[in-house]
Regions:
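Extended, solvent-exposed polar beta/coil surface segments
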Residues: 1-16, 52, 128-141
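Charged catalytic cores and adjacent phosphate/nucleic-acid-binding surfaces used
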Residues: 1-47, 60-77, 81-103, 154-280
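Divalent metal-dependent hydrolysis catalytic cores, especially in the metallo-beta-lactamase
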Residues: 40-57, 145-147
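Hydrophobic, aromatic-enriched interface-forming segments
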Residues: 123-166, 181
Length: 280
């Protein structure tokens, strides 16, 4: 006999690109997590949410531990600068770790980041900026997801090459398929050039997008630092507010919804099978 159990769940508002500090070389140890939470709840109608605090090339341990103490759904994240080609501008890429919010874990990650980025705000033409392979090798003992910027003129993956440069499409297609799980932007508008870039690489299907605010000031949330930033369109995730929930959603695009208002409740159906036989 088959039994189907329905579990009703709420869509999860996610923002995985929030800065705690204007200057990543001098982190703000007094970042106002409570203010951020209040602004998020005001925006999302007091719905469940998951966030990541992604400063440039470092992790604000103080802010993460404060957020953990508030019982928030958190993923450890960093906004990395990565070099695609020598003598070309670096691009920005988020890395999210499947790791507990603990002192020693964050210290271990920051130790690696300090080796990779002695200066947390390198010039985008800095030849010492690590490439994707160095990043992967450096964090090979951790479980992580990589999501590069898309659509934004500053730091987007598809702008990390020199004008007129003839790329090996096979190599870049391999980088995307093997290393990236999607990309980030403030909304779905302005993605034409990013999507066109993927098509030139032979990637014709739509690539999973996670929208994020790129906020620096919790009082002004969800505004970005840039006055030219496009309007923010929230992403709602139909999964548990965890790293694994994010990974699942990036593999099943139907689990990511883009809306300024909360989508309807969703349900997971768990099917069980009872075997009724006296010989079993």
């Amino acid at each position: 006999m088959n039994n189907t159990n329905r579990i009703d769940m709420q869509p999860i508002y996610i923002d995985l690109h929030i800065h705690t500090s204007e200057n990543a070389n001098n982190l703000n140890t007094n970042y106002d997590i409570a203010e951020l939470v209040g602004q998020i709840k005001k925006l999302n109608g007091d719905s469940p949410f998951m966030i990541s605090l992604t400063d440039h090339n470092t992790i604000n341990k103080s802010a993460y531990l404060k957020a953990k103490n508030l019982g928030l759904n958190l993923i450890i994240g960093v906004e990395l600068h990565i070099q695609n080609r020598a003598e070309a501008k670096s691009y920005h890429c988020h890395i999210y770790f499947n790791a507990p919010i603990e002192d020693d874990v964050i210290d271990s990650l920051n130790e690696i980041l300090d080796e990779l980025y002695p200066n947390k705000l390198p010039d985008r033409n800095d030849p010492n900026t690590p490439d994707i392979q160095k990043i992967i090798n450096s964090f090979d003992t951790f479980d992580f997801i990589l999501l590069p910027h898309g659509s934004q003129k500053h730091g987007a993956f598809n702008y990390s090459i020199n004008d007129g440069e003839n790329l090996d499409n096979a190599i870049n297609r391999s980088i995307y398929y093997n290393q990236f799980d999607g990309f980030t932007a403030r909304n779905r508008r302005g993605l034409e050039e990013t999507i066109d870039y993927f098509k030139r690489l032979g990637i014709n299907e739509f690539i999973n997008l996670v929208t994020c605010t790129d906020n620096y000031n919790p009082i002004k949330y969800p505004e970005s630092k840039s006055s030219e930033a496009s309007e923010f369109l929230p992403t709602w995730m139909l999964a548990e507010p965890t790293f694994e929930g994010l990974r699942l959603s990036l593999s099943e695009s139907s689990r990511l919804k883009y809306s300024s208002t909360k989508p309807e409740y969703w349900a997971e159906y768990l099917k069980s099978v009872n075997l009724e036989n006296e010989n079993i």
